[in-house]
């Protein structure tokens, strides 16, 4: 959102909605609520929006083929809206640990019905390996008193990722 105007985002949302039914529809992938400074900056750029996610929602950019990276600083209302639109989170633990962005709350996302799939975040991560990404995800959850079983990790990296991609 930071690199686009409201008009540009609305135009992108219009295209996304317009072609949603053709050949399976378009995908939309972007970042959301990765770190606190970014969230504050988006609030300054889009003062009429309730939250960072709301910027995308108002522009028609949340669909079942919308994949939003990070989502660390989403609130309950944001997670509820993501579930309503069937949008997914690309959980990027390696990047988030490396950059000190914060800890993604998988339990809250899951409880809200938001799909989560692990992602390497090649631009900010330390590895493209999904197994290393899952290992970092395990650590992120453990730091919050949450648990990722081997089955949850396997599901997230396979079927969960396919769900996020609407396959």
Over which residues does each language-model region extend?
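Short, acidic/turn-prone active-site loops that include or flank metal/cofactor-
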Residues: 34, 93-97, 121-124
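His/Asp/Glu-enriched, well-ordered alpha-helical/loop segment
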Residues: 58-65, 107-167
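Histidine/acidic residue-rich metal-binding segments in metalloenzymes
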Residues: 1-88, 100-116
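Short, charged, surface-exposed secondary-structure boundary motifs
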Residues: 98-103, 127-129
């Amino acid at each position: 959102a930071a690199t686009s105007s409201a008009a540009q985002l609305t135009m992108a949302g219009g295209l996304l909605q317009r072609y949603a039914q053709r050949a399976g529809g378009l995908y939309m992938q972007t970042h959301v609520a990765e770190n606190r400074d970014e969230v504050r900056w988006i609030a300054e750029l889009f003062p009429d929006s309730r939250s960072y996610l709301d910027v995308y929602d108002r522009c028609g950019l949340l669909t079942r083929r919308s994949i939003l990276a990070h989502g660390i600083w989403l609130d309950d209302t944001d997670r509820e809206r993501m579930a309503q639109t069937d949008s997914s989170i690309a959980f990027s633990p390696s990047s988030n640990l490396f950059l000190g962005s914060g800890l993604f709350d998988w339990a809250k996302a899951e409880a809200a019905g938001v799909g989560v799939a692990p992602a390497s975040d090649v631009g900010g991560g330390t590895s493209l390996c999904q197994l290393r990404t899952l290992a970092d995800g395990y650590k992120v959850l453990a730091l919050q008193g949450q648990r990722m079983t081997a089955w949850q990790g396997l599901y997230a990296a396979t079927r969960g990722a396919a769900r996020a991609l609407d396959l």
